[in-house]
Each structure stands twice: as structure tokens, then as C-alpha cells.
């Protein structure tokens, strides 16, 4: 599981140092320039809190069977990328809640040790570490996407309605509502009370809320797209296929046979490639008897095989995501480990366009 600290995180570190460094220098003039080194330790503490949060997401995601791609820390904090296909409301909720819970545990541990820390820098660092972890836990539990609390809202609506797309849309709108509340609290209330919010507070509120609004909007769009997928039966776009051994020679294969698209498989029955009539027709007649299908097959990406689990919505999501990840023109689908058919990206796109009332693509 790769862990990345993006270069943009350095911007966040500089901001933290610029914020806390002057205060430390004022309280501890004896430190001199080292006060900013202590500020750097504050930034490292924040990085540790973020990485523990994201690692908790990753560990639980892997534990419930998802493939985890990476853990990333950046200027916005961090994120964990994983394939959420085949999830359930329960697994989605578990993955979401464990991040804030990990921060809460860290915060409580730091708070418990804090009274025993030496006065001065160690005590200040522990207190700050406890505070930032509790703050991260509380902020991430706000009930709207793209925050973890929004994932909990999505899981709850998904569980109640049986519709993952509806859960995503509702959680996205909740995310927009959270943005409005944060803006009112951070900027609106001070203005209404006659106070003037400082520039730093305004700038960071705007930046954070812009990020949250963008994430909420993307969630709504994704939910609507998932809703379209839910209206399509995968059987409509799956063409029958038949297995052809990679050891076969061309005379053994009729690519125009009515009983399925020829798919080359290995000795264990795993789909490897497609055969086309054009490729076979290009082989001279005098060579056909001894030309193996492996010489003319169109080998596909290793991830081109999609196992169908029997849930139409999840199967469609898996197909679309695999097309996006592999950029393949065709995917092989299996049921119970046995070749079941082939899906064309063009035919899938045409079926989705028809559902949405769009004109056929050229």
C-alpha cells in the first residue's frame, strides 16, 4: 500500500509554521530561531494525525475486501484511494467512521499523557497534538460529502432505501448545506455582530469551503450517474462468448460461429485475449494449419476480466470502472470463475445514451 506525501503538503507545513512560530517565539524568547523549528514539529504532528487517519481508512477498506491503491497527504489534509466496488452500507460506514475514531483515540491518548510531560515545548507539543486530533475527528464527522460524515450519511440512506445512488446524492446535498453553515458561522456571524473577521480567517474559510463545495457537487453528479447505471440490466450489453484454448490452431476456430465471441483462454480457463475474423483472414492459407491462435490474438490488459456477482447495479459499476481504468475496448465477464461473455465499451455507451434519451454516437 503506497503512502505518498504530496509536494503541496509543504505549503500546509509552511502555513502551520508561520502561524505558530511567532507565538512560540514570543512565549519563549530564549529559543530564538529554534521557535520556528518547534513550529515545524507542530506541522509534523499534523502530518502524523492525517496519515494515521488515512491509514485507518485503508486498513479497514482492505479488511472488508477492497483493493487499496494509495494513502496520500496533501495541502487539503489527505485521502485514501481504493476500489469501492462490491461494498455494502455496513462496510462503507465502517471505512468512513474509523478515520475520525483513530484521531479521537490519538487525541485522548495525547491528552492523557499531557499532564506528565515536562513543562515547556514537550507539554505544548502534546497539547497541540491532542487538540488537532480532536479537531480533525470533529470536522471530518460533519454530515456531508466529501467528509467522512457524508460517507456515513450516504451509507445510512443506502441502507434505508436500498439505493446507493440516492445515498450519494443526498450526502452531496448535505455537503453543500455544511458549506453554507460553515460560511455563516465563520464569516456571517462575526459580521452580523459588528466584528470584522481577520483576512486569514476569511481566506482559509473560502478555500476550505470551495474545496468542500466542489467535492459535494462532484458527489451529486456521481450519484446521478450511478442512478443511470441502476436502470440498465447488464445482460443487455453482455454478448455470449466461447472459450478457445491458446494452444488451438486456426482451423479449429470459426470466428463467425453463432454461439459466441471467441475468447482465448489459458490452461486454467482464464480469459487472455480476443480473436477477430480480420486477424485470422490475414494469415495466408498455406500457413493456417500450423498457426496457433496465440499468434493472431489481440491480447487484453490483465485487468480486463470482470467477475459478475449477481447484483446488477454493482456489476454495472464494476464494468464502467474497469473500462475507465484499463481504457480497453472490450471486457470479458465471468460467473463463478467461468467465462460468461464479452462487453463492448461502444455498446455499453450506446445503451446508456439510449436510457438518457441521447442521440446515438457516431
Give residue ranges: language-model regions.
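Hydrophobic transmembrane alpha-helices and their immediate loop junctions
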Residues: 1-330, 334-362
Amino acid at each position: 500500500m503506497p503512502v505518498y506525501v504530496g509536494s503541496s503538503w509543504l505549503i500546509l507545513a509552511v502555513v502551520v509554521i508561520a502561524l505558530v512560530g511567532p507565538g512560540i517565539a514570543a512565549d519563549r524568547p530564549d529559543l530564538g530561531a529554534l521557535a520556528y523549528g518547534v513550529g515545524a514539529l507542530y506541522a509534523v504532528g499534523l502530518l502524523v494525525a492525517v496519515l494515521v487517519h488515512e491509514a485507518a481508512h485503508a486498513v479497514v477498506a482492505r479488511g472488508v475486501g477492497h483493493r487499496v491503491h494509495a494513502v496520500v497527504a496533501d495541502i487539503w489534509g489527505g485521502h485514501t484511494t481504493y476500489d469501492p466496488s462490491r461494498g455494502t452500507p455496513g462496510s462503507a460506514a465502517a471505512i468512513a467512521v474509523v478515520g475520525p475514531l483513530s484521531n479521537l483515540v490519538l487525541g485522548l491518548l495525547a491528552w492523557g499523557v499531557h499532564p506528565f510531560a515536562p513543562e515547556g515545548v514537550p507539554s505544548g507539543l502534546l497539547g497541540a497534538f491532542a487538540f488537532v486530533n480532536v479537531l480533525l475527528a470533529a470536522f471530518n464527522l460533519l454530515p456531508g460529502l466529501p467528509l467522512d460524515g457524508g460517507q456515513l450519511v450516504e451509507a445510512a440512506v443506502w441502507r434505508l432505501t436500498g439505493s446507493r445512488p440516492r445515498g450519494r446524492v443526498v450526502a452531496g446535498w448535505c455537503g453543500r448545506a455544511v458549506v453554507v453553515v460553515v460560511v455563516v458561522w465563520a464569516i456571517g456571524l462575526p459580521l452580523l455582530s459588528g466584528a470584522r473577521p481577520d483576512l486569514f480567517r476569511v481566506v482559509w474559510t473560502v478555500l476550505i469551503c470551495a474545496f468542500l463545495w466542489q467535492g459535494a457537487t462532484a458527489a451529486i453528479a456521481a450519484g446521478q450517474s450511478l442512478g443511470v447505471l441502476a436502470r440498465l440490466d447488464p445482460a443487455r450489453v453482455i454478448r455470449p462468448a466461447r472459450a478457445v484454448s491458446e494452444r488451438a490452431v486456426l482451423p479449429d476456430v470459426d470466428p463467425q460461429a453463432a454461439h459466441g465471441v471467441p475468447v482465448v483462454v489459458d490452461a486454467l480457463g482464464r480469459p487472455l485475449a480476443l480473436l477477430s475474423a480480420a486477424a485470422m483472414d490475414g494469415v495466408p492459407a498455406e500457413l493456417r494449419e500450423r498457426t496457433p491462435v496465440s499468434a493472431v490474438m489481440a491480447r487484453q490488459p490483465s485487468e480486463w476480466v470482470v467477475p459478475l456477482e449477481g447484483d446488477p447495479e454493482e456489476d454495472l459499476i464494476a464494468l464502467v470502472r474497469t473500462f475507465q481504468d484499463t481504457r480497453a475496448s472490450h471486457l470479458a465477464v465471468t460467473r463463478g470463475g467461468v467465462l460468461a461473455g464479452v462487453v463492448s465499451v461502444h455498446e455499453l455507451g450506446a445503451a446508456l445514451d439510449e436510457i438518457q434519451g441521447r442521440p446515438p454516437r457516431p
